[in-house]
């Protein structure tokens, strides 16, 4: 099995005029990026050949300057081969805003799909506070995120995305995640997964994932309110191996629980 990996993160605030620049990112290229991630052991265990592209992480800040973003996103897309890979693993934030573009995650995934098409599975790991546009589940075959706030499961989240990607490759499946939304706006850091209403919602998501046959992933994203976009806010992405109707029903149920 041969997979390409990449990571581009910056939790954005579209309400500030101060741009985030390339110099604000911690960068690692090629094999050096594996030291920044927490998936090396599983890659070795499964004897997966890795095509590393770019790791770029910045602290939360304003919109990423367009030219700098295009260079960074291009570093990932250009590093993914057109042929000879079985899948793509990405570690993104989910609330990156880019000057003149909008969602940095959606743009990156669009560029990637333009290059590799839709017959290669793409798995994405994100932050719990991801503001996912409707494009995200249309462009990725699996989307997961942190399941703790405050965040204490970075490694588990990265591994979960990799494990799902391995399943997709081994079973030759291309799942189609489904998304639903809750029409509320809550300051992200005020929400903790150990307290209501998230405690019950997270428990139900875990039950769905555990008990429903063929369920690949049930993810709760609380979103964050500093992205001035229509897709800002809590969103729920559910991935079933083959049944999109079941996935949508589960996503809708979680949204109603908020």
Regions found by a protein language model. Name each.
Residues 39-41, 73-83:
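Short, charged beta->alpha transition segments
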Residues 81, 114-117, 145-148, 163-174, ...:
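Generic secondary-structure signature for well-ordered alpha-helical cores
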Residues 158-209:
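Conserved anion/nucleotide-ligand pocket segment
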Residues 54-75:
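Charged, often glycine-rich, active-site loop that binds/positions anionic groups
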Residues 1-45:
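N-terminal amphipathic/basic leader segments beginning at the initiator methionine
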């Amino acid at each position: 099995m041969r997979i390409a990996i990449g990571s581009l993160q910056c939790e954005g605030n579209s309400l500030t005029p101060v741009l985030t620049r390339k110099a604000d990112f911690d960068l690692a290229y090629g094999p050096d990026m594996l030291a920044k991630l927490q998936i090396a052991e599983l890659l070795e265990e499964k004897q997966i050949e890795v095509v590393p592209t770019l790791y770029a992480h910045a602290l939360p800040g304003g919109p990423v300057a367009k030219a700098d973003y295009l260079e960074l996103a291009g570093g990932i897309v250009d590093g993914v081969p057109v042929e000879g890979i079985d899948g793509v693993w990405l570690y993104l934030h989910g609330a990156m805003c880019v000057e003149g573009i909008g969602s940095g995650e959606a743009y990156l995934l669009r560029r990637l799909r333009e290059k590799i098409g839709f017959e290669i599975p793409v798995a994405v790991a994100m932050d719990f506070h991801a503001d996912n546009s409707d494009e995200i589940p249309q462009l990725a075959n699996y989307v997961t995120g942190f399941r703790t706030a405050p965040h204490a499961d970075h490694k588990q989240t990265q591994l979960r995305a990799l494990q799902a990607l391995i399943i997709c490759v081994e079973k030759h499946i291309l799942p189609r995640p489904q998304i639903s939304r809750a029409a509320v706006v809550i300051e992200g850091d005020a929400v903790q997964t150990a307290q209501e209403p998230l405690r019950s919602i997270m428990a139900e998501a875990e039950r769905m994932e555990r008990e429903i046959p063929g369920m690949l992933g049930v993810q709760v994203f609380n979103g964050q309110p500093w992205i001035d976009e229509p897709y800002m806010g809590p969103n729920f992405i559910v991935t079933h191996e083959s049944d999109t109707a079941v996935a949508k029903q589960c996503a809708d149920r979680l949204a109603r629980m908020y």
